[in-house]
Design a protein with these regions (language model features):
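Polytopic alpha-helical membrane-helix bundles and their juxtamembrane interface segments
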Residues: 1-58, 63-198
Length: 198
């Protein structure tokens, strides 16, 4: 799925405008490349009981990029056109989004390795997730956007997977990773192509 979506998404890179969406697509393709590399390593070297813990090394890299790219898309739909202007204008929001995402991941990781109880990790992680997506909804153009609703649902399901037994958890994580990390890149290509047709 990663290879197919990457090949499809690369066609969007040949289009130069709208620049902000093309830059966002490049970030999503980097996410897909990291995911692909991680899964190759995961399948070759890592035992089932260590898979969930190891995923966090992927997520610590990819989720900040995914949050920046989805926020950039929503801001584009609000009328923003410059990545540089977005970085200046929404610096505070981006910092808060990335910090709350970090808190969510740290809680999950510490719960997985047994430093804190798993249910405590669920509570902390859920609170951090709500904070993250509330900022995107309220300040970054997520309100009223159907893609925001879909992404929120998919990300929320990671919390459901977290409490499942190892085998079921990793199957669900695999499915959610494919959706969350590949769907948006394909969607961006569609948006870029549609904009150029118009």
């Amino acid at each position: 799925a990663q290879a197919v979506s990457s090949l499809f998404a690369q066609k969007g890179l040949w289009i130069k405008e709208p620049k902000l969406l093309v830059q966002t697509l490049r970030l999503e393709l980097l996410v897909t490349a990291i995911q692909f590399t991680f899964y190759v390593a995961l399948l070759r070297n890592i035992k089932l009981e260590h898979m969930a813990i190891t995923r966090y090394f992927d997520w610590f890299l990819t989720t900040p990029m995914m949050l920046v790219s989805m926020s950039s898309y929503f801001l584009y739909k609000k009328g923003e056109r410059s990545a540089g202007e977005i970085a200046k204008k929404y610096k505070s929001q981006f910092v808060r989004i990335l910090l709350s995402n970090l808190a969510m991941l740290l809680a999950g990781y510490l719960g997985e390795i047994g430093v804190i109880p798993k249910m405590s990790a669920v509570v902390i992680g859920t609170a951090a997730f709500i904070i993250t997506f509330r900022i995107i909804y309220k300040d970054m153009g997520g309100a009223g956007n159907n893609i925001f609703k879909l992404i929120s649902l998919v990300w929320g399901l990671y919390g459901v997977a977290y409490v499942l037994p190892e085998s079921e958890k990793n199957v669900m994580y695999n499915a959610l990773d494919v959706i969350s990390k590949n769907f948006f890149a394909i969607f961006l290509v569609r948006e870029i192509s549609k904009t150029n047709i118009e």
